[in-house]
Curated annotation (Swiss-Prot):
Positions with biased composition (Polar residues): 265-278
Start-end of Basic and acidic residues biased regions: 214-237
Span of domain KH type-2: 38-106
Lineage: Bacteria, Bacillati, Actinomycetota, Actinomycetes, Pseudonocardiales
UniProt cross-references to NCBIfam families, sorted A to Z: rpsC_bact (TIGR01009)
Organism, as annotated: Saccharopolyspora erythraea (strain ATCC 11635 / DSM 40517 / JCM 4748 / NBRC 13426 / NCIMB 8594 / NRRL 2338)
Transmembrane parts of this sequence: none
Protein name, as recorded: Small ribosomal subunit protein uS3
This protein's UniProt keywords: Ribonucleoprotein, Ribosomal protein, RNA-binding, rRNA-binding
Stretch list, region Disordered: 212-298
PANTHER family: 30S/40S RIBOSOMAL PROTEIN S3 (PTHR11760), SMALL RIBOSOMAL SUBUNIT PROTEIN US3C (PTHR11760:SF19)
A family per Pfam: KH_2
Length: 298
């Protein structure tokens, strides 16, 4: 199932959103046909603009059109002349006020539709299809958010009499996993041998609860010595080693603390030692010296 169906339609409402957002009761078919006409008119004559997708949102009296493009300068034109022309054409088509928003695609190498357009453009310029596919894969895999890509070309490849399809894949592309963020793009290349279809699948990681599990691969882990800020060590006092238990400071066993106090007492300055000696001599009992006559008798 996942190998055949369009990845956007397969995951619609689960991990992907609609490209047309509006509600209609009796005018549903008219709005669908109008959306198709809007997208066709924007694609006609704008091949070099690199349009990735067109989102349409309707209200009662206004139509908002968001154009996602890799080259916004081509869509806007000089002093906004091209944008004004597009807006007037769409207002004439819909009969309503059109709000035109032109959004730039930041990473064109990770957009499946733009990759498919790039491969198709090379095929139209008579570049070998294998070379074009491999070049697209290499450029896409350089992007940190791309985990896998698959590119497929079908038609009279190389001018062969019988049409066939070939694909190249690099990385992981789980088409049947609903939580997988799969971007899909399709474009047709017009060659002298006929049309060649180009399909591109790009895997960008997994989505959990509709939100992307962003794996920050661009944030390279800093080397040792340059890591993020850590909590500083608590300031320690002078390290005192206890002879009995081998502990330092005020911690340790009672024997260790007693030995530490003993060693502390033994390590005294000369002034303290002299003072303590005077105190000890003052407190010592006095012994009477023998008299001279007792010495002679002895």
């Amino acid at each position: 199932m996942g190998q055949k169906i369009n990845p956007h339609g397969f995951r619609l409402g689960i991990t992907t959103d609609w490209k047309s957002r509006w509600y209609a009761d009796k005018q549903y078919s008219e709005y669908v046909a109008e959306d198709v006409k809007i997208r066709r008119r924007l694609s006609r004559g704008m091949e070099r603009a690199g349009i990735s997708k067109v989102e349409i949102e309707r209200t009662r009296e206004r139509v908002r059109v968001d154009i996602h493009t890799a080259r916004p300068g081509i869509v806007i034109g000089r002093r906004g002349a091209e944008a004004d022309r597009i807006r007037g054409s769409l207002e004439k088509l819909t009969g309503k006020q059109v709000q035109l928003n032109i959004l730039e695609v930041k990473n064109a190498e990770a957009d499946a539709q733009l990759v498919a357009q790039g491969v198709a453009e090379q095929l139209s310029n008579r570049v070998s299809f294998r070379r074009a596919m491999r070049k697209a894969i290499q450029s896409a895999m350089r992007s940190p958010q791309v985990k896998g890509i698959r590119v497929q070309c079908g038609g009279r490849l190389g001018g062969a009499e019988m049409s066939r399809s070939e694909f190249y894949r690099e990385g992981r592309v789980p088409l049947h996993t609903l939580r997988a963020d799969i971007d899909y793009g399709f474009f047709e290349a017009r060659t002298t041998f006929g049309r060649i279809g180009v399909k591109v699948w790009i895997y960008k990681g997994e989505l959990v609860g509709g939100l992307k599990q962003k794996q920050q691969e661009s944030e390279v882990r800093p080397p040792r010595g340059e890591r993020g800020e850590r909590g500083g060590r608590p300031e320690r006092g002078g390290r005192r080693r206890s002879g009995a238990s081998g502990t330092t400071g005020s911690g340790g066993t009672e024997a260790g603390r007693a030995a530490a106090d003993k060693s502390k007492g033994s390590a005294q300055s000369p002034e303290q030692a002299q003072t303590s000696g005077d105190v000890a001599s003052a407190n010592a009992p006095q012994v009477a010296e023998p008299r001279a006559d007792e010495k002679t008798e002895g």
